[in-house]
Amino acid sequence: LLKAPIRRCWKDTRSVKKIPGLAGRVRVGAPDASLTPASGVVAVAELVGRLGVSAALDDAVGVIKQRDRGLSAGQFLVALAQAQMFGAEFWSGLDRRRADTAGEALSVVATPASTTAAGLAERFGPMELAGIEEGVGEIAGRVIGLLPAARRAALRAGGATIDLDGTDVECYGSKKEGIAYSYKGARAGRPHVATWAEAGVVTAADLLAGDEDPRPGAGSLIERSVATLRAAGVTVRAKVRGDVGYFASHIAQAAVAAGCDFSLGVARNPAVWRAATSIPEKAWRKAKRMKGAQVAVCDYAPAGWPPGTVTVVRRVKIRAQDISADPRARRRRTIPNGQLALALDGLLEHVYAYSFIATNLDVSTGAKAVAVEAWHRMRTDIEDRIRDAKHGAALRHLPSATRAANTVWMWGALLAVNLSAWLQELAGLDTADGRGRNHLGTLRHRLLVVPARLVRHAGQVTLRLPPGRQLLAQVLARLRRLPIWT
């Protein structure tokens, strides 16, 4: 009789049967087209369909193709924004979305091929880009009309803030159009963005080169943002808010000409330092929500600025031992030179760091000045929107060789941020004040990129999600109670 082969397990070898779990017995079967990694696309489809987003953008942007076939301008913009919401980082990400058969069946718009999308983006000129902003205003108005009365009144009549800021997007390739070396030494494009702070919505944007100064275009951003707010039904006088990078008389004048008030950071110059030292000690008031900070008003008014401009001053007490020894430290620039020298020599126990705001808002009392300073400090809201566009969507890349295509890519990211804000506002994921919304990356994890099986049976379509607490059913229930825009 032949003996069976002897099964040996050497010293460093383990039997497959001894591997924990099922790892040793798993085989890969045939692909299942009923599975999707992104079941949340149905929530975006409900939002886009009920608000009429594609149609609103079509009406505002107009026709971008001679033949009426394939995607319209609005459908293309929705598809691009949706792809970035679901993780597309470059044009090739659209091809991965197209490969998701079940997800495409749930989508309200078809995802174009990457080459088609890049070609469509080239068709957008200045008029079409202006139409995107017009469409945003129309859609924002529809969203506000569906909100509870208190939130609707707060957005339309309670206060409207236009924030201004820019960001650099590092790029590679010496032949890219509209890309230049920034002051940081990197080749970059520079999205210049205006947002409606209370609604968390981008209202206007330009794509500049890395070496372009954003200040000359700030007046246009303000004017276009005001038009967007008016289209959304805002009746209150808007306020323009910006950091020290927008310290320019023509920006303040543009804000006033557009029917806005302004609050802009002031560059630290000898005149404003002298004005700060003349503030009586008894004039200082404790700042809101900032430990060790005090607020006062000085009589400094920059030359050429609108009548009624005053300067609000904030100072923060700093221990001498906490001052950085690095002469490049930013905090050192906020301390008067005389105080800084004495503190570094050990002759003072503490100093004050100063910040300045030029505004035409009412700061006639100490309480009003404190309120204005606390509100101005919230200008960092726009940094959160830009961060979401870069790390939640894909504004961290400008993937094309032409400025036109990169500008449309930028708007895809900004529309993704807007769709995220509108979705959370209407689905009850926000806290009814604009402060409780998730970043797009978190929303992607919690709602959008959740795997599911698409089941069709007896004329019904069912999504089977993994076990556990899922948001999709709750979100769909809320969205489906909304009327369909016609």
Regions found by a protein language model. Give the residues of each.
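Dynamic "connector" segments at or just before major functional cores
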Residues: L1-R187, P191-D213, A218-A232, Q424, ...
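Short, surface-exposed basic-aromatic patches at helix termini and helix-loop junctions that form
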Residues: A252-D261
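An anionic, glycine-rich sequence signature occurring as long contiguous blocks
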Residues: S15-V26, S263-I382, R387-H391, A477-T486
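Basic, amphipathic alpha-helical segments enriched in Lys/Arg and hydrophobic/aromatic residues
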Residues: R396-R464, R469, V475
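Short amphipathic alpha-helical "interface-anchor" segments enriched in bulky aromatics
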Residues: L47, L94, A369-R403, V408, ...
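Acidic/histidine-rich, metal-coordinating catalytic segments
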Residues: D165, V236-F247
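Short, surface-exposed connector motifs at secondary-structure boundaries
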Residues: A231-A238, A257-A258
